[in-house]
Design a protein with these regions (language model features):
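Active-site-adjacent betaalpha module
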Residues: 1-16, 23, 28-32, 56-65, ...
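Short glycine-rich, polar/acidic loop-and-turn segments at beta strand-coil junctions
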Residues: 22, 47, 73-76
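A short acidic, glycine-rich active-site loop
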Residues: 37-53, 94-105
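A structural signal for short, well-ordered beta-strand segments and their strand-loop junctions
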Residues: 70-72, 204
Length: 220
C-alpha cells in the first residue's frame, strides 16, 4: 500500500461509517436516555443527530461514484463479557436499566435512514477503533482502497481511534467535520484540531462530494 505521506486519493477511497447505531444517534436510544435522565452529563443529542443527513448524502455520493461504503458498528454480548469499554462510567452496561449496543437488540442496529445496501460490508468491533481485531484492513486492501473517508460518532472516541488506526495501517485519512459529532461540542472542536494537525485531512461534506464528482468526471 502506498505511503500516507502522499495526499489522499479520492478515486481510491472508501467511506467508513462509524457507529451510526440507534443507541448512539436515535432520539430513543441509549445516549438520548442519558441526555433525558442525567442532563448534567451534557449529552448534546441534537448535535449528534445533525450528522445523519450529511452521512446519508456522503453514502449516496460514494455509491454514485462507484466507491465502496463500509459500515463499522460497536456491538457486545448481552453479558458484556467481550466489551472493551467500562460502560458503567456513563451509566450504561451491566446493571443498567436498559441494554446498550447489545448484539441482536434494536439499539445496536444501524439507524433506518442509513441502512447498508446489498453487498456493503458491516464490520463489528468490540472496542473503539474500526481496525483493531477486525477484518477491516483486509476488506479495504482487497478493494484496492488507499484513502479512508471517516464519518460517524463519536469524534473523540471511536471516530478518532479509527482515524489513528487507519494511519497506523498506512491509509490516507479524510475526516468529514460536519458528518462527525461528539456528545460535547467543545471537545469535538478540540479533537478536530488534533486530527487536522496530525492524522487527517479535515473536509466538509460539500468538499468531499465535489472531490468525488471531479474524480468521476476525470475517469469519463
Amino acid at each position: 500500500m502506498e505511503n500516507t505521506m502522499m495526499g489522499p486519493e479520492i478515486a481510491k477511497s472508501a467511506l467508513l461509517i462509524v457507529d451510526m447505531e440507534n443507541d448512539f444517534v436515535h432520539p430513543e436510544g441509549g445516549f438520548a436516555h442519558i441526555a433525558r435522565e442525567a442532563p448534567a452529563a451534557g449529552f448534546d443529542m441534537p448535535f449528534l443527530m445533525r450528522t445523519i443527513p450529511h452521512v446519508k448524502r456522503l453514502a449516496d455520493a460514494f455509491r454514485t461514484a462507484g466507491r465502496p461504503v463500509v459500515y463499522i458498528a460497536h456491538m457486545v454480548k448481552p453479558d458484556y463479557s467481550d466489551a472493551q469499554f467500562p460502560y458503567w462510567r456513563i451509566g450504561l452496561g451491566p446493571g443498567a436499566s436498559r441494554p446498550f449496543i447489545v448484539e441482536g437488540t434494536w439499539g445496536a442496529q444501524i439507524i433506518d435512514a442509513l441502512q447498508p445496501r446489498a453487498g456493503e460490508h458491516l464490520v463489528i468491533k468490540k472496542g473503539f477503533g474500526g481496525f483493531a481485531n477486525t477484518p477491516l484492513d483486509t476488506i479495504l486492501r482487497t478493494m484496492g482502497v488507499t484513502t479512508c473517508v471517516v464519518v460517524g460518532v463519536t469524534t473523540c472516541v471511536c471516530v478518532s481511534t479509527t482515524v489513528r488506526g487507519g494511519v497506523e495501517h498506512n491509509y490516507r485519512m479524510i475526516l468529514v467535520k460536519d458528518a462527525v459529532a461528539e456528545v460535547n461540542r467543545e471537545t469535538h472542536e478540540g479533537e478536530l484540531q488534533t486530527m487536522a494537525r496530525l492524522f487527517a485531512d479535515v473536509k466538509t461534506t460539500d468538499e468531499v462530494v465535489a472531490m468525488l464528482a471531479s474524480a468521476k468526471a476525470a475517469r469519463n
